[in-house]
Amino acid sequence: MDNHANEINKLSRELGLLSNYEFNMDELKNLSPLDSTSSSIYIGDNLTYLQGLSKTSPKTIDFCYIDPPYNTGNKIIYHDNRKSVSSDIFGLHNEWMSFLLPRLFHAHKMLKDTGIIAISIDDYEFAHLKILMDKIFGEDNFIGNIVVCRSKNGKGSKRNIASAHEYLLVYGKSDMAELSGQPDDKSLYDKVDCFGEYRIDGMFRKKGDSSLRTDRPNMFYPLYFNPSTGEVQVEPELGLKTVYPIDSKGIERRWLWSKETARERSWELFASKNGVVYVKNYSSSHKRIKVRTLWNDSSFYTERATNEITKIFGSKVFDTPKALNYIMSIINCMAKPDALILDFFAGSGTTAHAAAVLNSLDGGSRKTILMESNHPITKTHIAYKSGFRKISDITISRLNYVSDNFPDFKYKKIEII
């Protein structure tokens, strides 16, 4: 048996799952290594492609985003009912976990050591996804869990709870993985001087550990400030007030910088009328901050996503789309402008669309590798009535839409099965 299959089956047994995985190379004899020079869509069973590409193209992916089935049991365009009848440790969730395990395993193999994966999920399978990810990627490589508001009023009435959020679970391939950070919020910069827009970020007097005068004696010195303008300088001058880094309890502390640094960067300091010295934080178009774990933006809401789908396709051909701005924000925070991005539950193709928009905005060269099923669409679904016969037809239609609107966007289609 193939080594990958052995590893997956070992993981499955350790988790207490009932599945047994087999690797069939016959289906992949015509599969070429990953072409990272263009965007691509692989049509068919994503597991087949993942297991092949993890062999031919390991460590090629910079970032992976997926929006897998949530196992809701709802009748939507794709199969979303993998509730088991077994009575093992995971009960109803066994089949869903067994479905995702090999796919996540191969995605892990495809990621670079610096790679990152982000997965959308809701309450029903969050805990079980976390177990899978901890096992495959390692608990130490858990980066964070982002709570994403998906609607204003929420949905459902179970026990008088209206769920208005879902999650974005983020892991790195190794300790070398690092988020790009989210763009700073320019609206927070409420002051301006000749050097640009700025905000007051924190006191210039050191707090906490190693903040005493005795810790760094050379960082205890007087500053001189103008109470009318807030300007601060190191040299004394007639009419200026003097301030030392002494706190409200009379404890002698120290400044953040040496006297020489404060002299060179005095333009970055600001004093209040009562002599509290602060550091100015200037705005920059390239500035990044740590990714926050709560995202509440109306442009991320499901309603916005549905409106976008309706505008592009003429009707709601996909039941569970993600908003374009939401996927753009994920990619922008977690991947570099030249990233190769994998989405093996491509759905309505939003990931490719988001990457194309970002490239047009910042001159990036992001490429997307998509995978989507060629499963037939039921005749009663609105997508069938709109002319689509397979789920992948919707994805390809979105890619054509992107190509029509972004001339630099090109893609190729791979279907070997």
Swiss-Prot record:
Q: Which terms does the record give in the GO molecular function aspect?
A: DNA binding; N-methyltransferase activity; site-specific DNA-methyltransferase (adenine-specific) activity
Catalytic activities: a 2'-deoxyadenosine in DNA + S-adenosyl-L-methionine = an N(6)-methyl-2'-deoxyadenosine in DNA + S-adenosyl-L-homocysteine + H(+)
Q: What is its EC number?
A: 2.1.1.72
Claim: Isomerase is one of the keywords in the record: no
Q: Which InterPro entries match?
A: DNA_methylase_N4/N6, DNA_methylase_N6_adenine_CS, N4/N6-MTase_EcoPI_Mod-like, SAM-dependent_MTases_sf
Pfam families assigned: N6_N4_Mtase
For biological process, the GO terms are:
DNA restriction-modification system; methylation
- Which keywords annotate this record? Methyltransferase, Restriction system, S-adenosyl-L-methionine, Transferase
Sequence similarity: Belongs to the N(4)/N(6)-methyltransferase family.
**Listed name of the protein:** Type II methyltransferase M.KpnI
